[in-house]
């Protein structure tokens, strides 16, 4: 049985569609209403303004025409002005002039003029609004609003795909030609490429799958952190399949007009079907695909929700024989609506994650093809020192190194340029103009020396790459740089977390031991150390405070830490605070004792920093080794074996490079 409410809704939707589909008619109706309003206010004022120009009038009265004729017959009228639709009479009343105005007078009153002549009253005719004046008064508001309309249409045409009059139309095909990107251009995401290769095969040979009755996924969702190559991978799929590529951002569906998003989705899918086989790519789909259960929206009429509903309907409308694939990208998959991820829509999710060592090396090779590298450049070292960076970051490092080399008028990019670019990526730009006084420079030198010493002596810490007291970034007056040079690490053990805490406390402890007074420079270190210990208690179950209970739950997000929810009692919170405080005090005491045992090493390191402002990691290790030998102490360097191994590998590579250059030189001589 039909639902009458549905009929009413359909009627309302039809009415809305009528005005959306007939914008010119809507504009005409709107213009007529404006003209009527304009005439009612302006027309009368113009007529009155034309006549009311007599000076010395004390009062104006709106009266009937018969009242004016009566006054004329009484001889009280001094002068009269006439128009086809109005009569104005000036009357002397107790020594003051009063204007009587009568509107809508009879058109043919043949008695008025003879009466005025008989009473010897002066009169004159006033030219009213003629045909052209009336025409202008009617057309002026139309012209004004039409000019505004055209102005807005031109302003919004780029973003609206046809302007206001075509608000529902999708922008034209972004890539009018098929993309020339190939899978070889996308490196570091081999698993993701394998997942989407069957899509290419389906687009090239759809009949092969249709005959077998196979159902290819209608939608593939590419998820991963920013800068990992999701858009590039989507273009590569279209390029490999040689099909049209329709690309649009999720935010591009939402405009100021209600219903535009849904209409644009319909038009986009219609274009894709005409060009089939084809690919639709929706970047940042979370802009329109957020969960409807998350709240914060204004009911069923919300523009984003209408757009999402239309997208779901269009994806349901695909048949199994329609060779159109929808690719979408997001770095916030946890916010997407469940209906969008169900089977038959975006039922396949492909992780496009940050690359590992091999992936970073491949990406660096791709981006370094078009730049001139010096023979001594070792991209493997760069790949090892850029763990955790995405493909976009690596491309930026190559470009930044090229810019640095260009500023120094170099002919080739050297290894030092690449290392400086990496440093910029991790700790920011050098602040050469920020001058710090000698006292603060001394504090920073000992602070960073404390970090460096604990990094080298703590088992599980990352060894030092460089120590600097040159200000960088937003607020750092100095820094100790730790760049990984070993294998990829995905887990951290308890002793490694405690080593991080020791390294963070090393700066404050050095100030305490060598300066005799602490500064505000350790604020961020203490914050990070506290956060590590808190996670050990509430997330990792590494202490006896809560045992194996998880007290804090965070929502996974590729954009960093998501929302954290806590669910524990005040008593547990008190126990957690007590553990963190006691552990910090315990580790701080251990770090201070270690620094006192290596007093001379810290002192020498700080003096070296004050003299040169920057020292390399190998210099830090040399100073520590010399002090240990001087005092007859057993070596506590945690990375001694790794350093020896890396040095041997570096010497071997250098020897091979020299041999290669020598052989090339001999060949040139023979030629």
From Swiss-Prot:
It is found in: Cell inner membrane. Gene3D superfamilies: 1.10.8.60, 3.30.720.210, P-loop containing nucleotide triphosphate hydrolases (3.40.50.300), Peptidase M41 (1.20.58.760). Keywords: ATP-binding, Cell inner membrane, Cell membrane, Hydrolase, Membrane, Metal-binding, Metalloprotease, Nucleotide-binding, Protease, Transmembrane, Transmembrane helix, Zinc. The active site is at 448. Coiled coil: none annotated. Residues 44-130 are periplasmic. Its main location: membrane. The chain crosses the membrane at residues 23-43, 131-151. ATP binds at residues 224-231. One of its GO terms (cellular component) is plasma membrane. The keyword Translocase does not apply. One of its GO terms (biological process) is protein catabolic process. SUPFAM superfamilies: FtsH protease domain-like, P-loop containing nucleoside triphosphate hydrolases. GO terms for molecular function: ATP binding; ATP hydrolysis activity; ATP-dependent peptidase activity; metalloendopeptidase activity; zinc ion binding. Its cofactor is Zn(2+). Homohexamer. Acts as a processive, ATP-dependent zinc metallopeptidase for both cytoplasmic and membrane proteins. Plays a role in the quality control of integral membrane proteins. In the central section; belongs to the AAA ATPase family. This is ATP-dependent zinc metalloprotease FtsH. It comes from Sulfurovum sp. (strain NBC37-1). The lineage of its organism: Bacteria, Pseudomonadati, Campylobacterota, Epsilonproteobacteria, Campylobacterales. The gene is ftsH.
């Amino acid at each position: 049985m039909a639902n009458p409410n549905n009929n009413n809704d359909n009627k309302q939707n039809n009415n809305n569609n009528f005005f959306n589909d007939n914008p010119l008619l809507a504009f005409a109706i709107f213009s007529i209403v404006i003209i009527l309003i304009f005439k009612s206010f302006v027309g009368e004022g113009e007529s009155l303004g034309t006549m009311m120009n007599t000076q010395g009038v004390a009062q104006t009265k709106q009266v009937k025409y018969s009242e004016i004729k009566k006054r004329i017959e009484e001889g009280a009228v001094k002068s009269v002005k006439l128009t086809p639709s109005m009569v104005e009479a000036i009357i002397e009343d107790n020594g003051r002039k009063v204007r009587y105005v009568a509107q809508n007078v009879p058109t043919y009153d043949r008695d008025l003029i003879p009466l005025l002549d008989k009473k010897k009253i002066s009169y004159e005719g006033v030219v009213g609004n003629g045909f052209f004046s009336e025409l202008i008064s009617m057309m002026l508001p139309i012209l004004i609003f039409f000019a505004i309309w055209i102005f807005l249409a031109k302003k919004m045409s780029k973003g609206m795909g046809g302007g206001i009059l075509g608000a529902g139309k999708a922008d034209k095909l972004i890539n009018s030609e098929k993309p020339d990107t190939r899978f070889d251009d996308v490196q570091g995401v081999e698993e993701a490429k394998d997942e989407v290769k069957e899509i290419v095969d389906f687009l090239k040979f759809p009949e092969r799958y249709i005959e077998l009755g196979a159902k290819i996924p209608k939608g593939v969702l590419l998820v991963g952190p920013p800068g990992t190559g999701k858009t590039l991978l989507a273009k590569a799929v279209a390029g490999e399949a040689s099909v049209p590529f329709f690309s649009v951002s999720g935010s591009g569906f939402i405009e100021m007009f209600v219903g535009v998003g849904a209409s644009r989705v319909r038009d986009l899918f219609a274009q894709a079907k005409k060009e089939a086989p084809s690919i639709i790519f929706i970047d940042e789909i979370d802009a329109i695909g957020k969960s409807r259960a998350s709240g914060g929206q204004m009911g069923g009429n919300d523009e984003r929700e209408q757009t999402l509903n239309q997208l779901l309907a269009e994806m349901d409308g695909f048949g199994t024989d329609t060779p159109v694939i929808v690719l979408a990208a997001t770095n916030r998959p946890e916010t997407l609506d469940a209906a969008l991820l169900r089977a038959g829509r975006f039922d396949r999710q492909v992780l496009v994650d940050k690359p590992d060592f091999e992936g970073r090396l491949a990406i660096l090779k791709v981006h370094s093809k078009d730049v001139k590298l010096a023979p001594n450049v070792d991209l493997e070292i760069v790949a090892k020192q850029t763990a955790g960076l995405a493909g976009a970051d690596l491309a930026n490092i190559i470009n930044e190194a090229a810019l640095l080399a260009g500023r120094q008028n170099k002919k080739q990019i050297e290894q030092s340029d690449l290392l400086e670019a990496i440093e910029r990526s991790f700790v920011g730009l050098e602040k050469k103009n920020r001058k710090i006084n000698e006292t603060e420079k001394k504090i920073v030198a000992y602070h960073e020396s404390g970090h460096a010493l604990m990094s080298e002596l703590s088992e599980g810490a990352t060894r030092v790459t460089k120590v600097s007291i040159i200000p960088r970034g937003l607020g750092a007056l100095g820094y100790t740089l730790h760049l990984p040079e070993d294998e990829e690490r995905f887990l951290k053990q308890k002793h490694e977390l405690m080593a991080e805490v020791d390294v963070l406390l090393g700066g404050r402890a050095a100030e305490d031991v060598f300066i005799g007074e602490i500064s505000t420079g350790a604020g961020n270190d203490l914050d990070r150390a506290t956060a590590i210990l808190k996670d050990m208690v509430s997330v990792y179950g590494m202490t006896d405070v809560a045992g194996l209970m998880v007290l804090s739950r965070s929502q996974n997000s590729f954009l960093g830490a998501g929302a954290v929810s806590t669910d524990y009692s005040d008593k547990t919170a008190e126990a957690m605070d007590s553990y963190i405080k006691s552990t910090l005090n315990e580790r701080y005491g251990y770090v201070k004792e270690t620094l006192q045992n290596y007093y001379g090493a810290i002192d020498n390191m700080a003096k070296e920093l004050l003299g040169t402002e920057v020292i390399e990691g190998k210099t830090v290790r040399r100073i520590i080794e010399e002090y240990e030998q001087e005092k007859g102490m057993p070596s506590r360097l945690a990375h001694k074996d790794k350093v020896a191994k890396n040095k041997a590998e570096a010497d071997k590579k250098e020897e091979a490079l020299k041999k290669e250059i020598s052989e090339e030189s001999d060949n040139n001589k023979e030629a």
